[in-house]
Amino acid sequence: ASDVYKRQIIDALDHGKRLVVDEFDSKMHPLLTSRIIGLFNSRVTNPRNAQLIFTTHDTNLLNASLFRRDQIWFTQKDSFGASELYSLAEYKVRNSAPFEKEYLMGKYGGIPVIGQFERLFDLREEEYGSTDEQA
């Protein structure tokens, strides 16, 4: 993480501020992201209740050891392209459930529509053969 980013994290924790980060997973190593989330979730390192709000595509973060269900939110595009925001807490899910696995299976929505790419995959296979073959 850059020095500026580190200062923003420390400032948020020291003063109980809200830190908003777009594409949190693109800014640093996954081990660092988990540690930073831990800093914000700890009463010891975050006594002023600072908030970390971020977007990510890193499904490894969908983990009950990092987040409560009410801290995990998903987006889903409707037929008009508008995004709907909803919480994992809206689902009847055990706290110990494998959030990442169930998300990737489509249980909570928010999964891209792969069907839109099927024709592209078919065209590539027709032109170059199976896309599963090793190069």
Give short role names for the model-derived ranges.
Residues 6-7, 38:
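A cross-family signal for key residues in well-ordered alpha-helices
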Residues 17-19, 52:
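Generic beta-sheet signal
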Residues 34-135:
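C-terminal lobe/lid and adjacent interdomain/linker elements of RecA-like ASCE P-loop ATPase modules
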Residues 9-17:
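Short basic/glycine-enriched coil/helix segment immediately N-terminal to the Walker B
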Residues 22-24:
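Walker B catalytic acidic pair
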Residues 1-5:
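Short, small-residue-biased leader/transition segments that mark boundaries at the very start
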Residues 26-30:
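Conserved D-loop-proximal element of ABC-family nucleotide-binding domains
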Residues 7-9, 61-62:
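Generic recognition of flexible, low-complexity loop/linker segments
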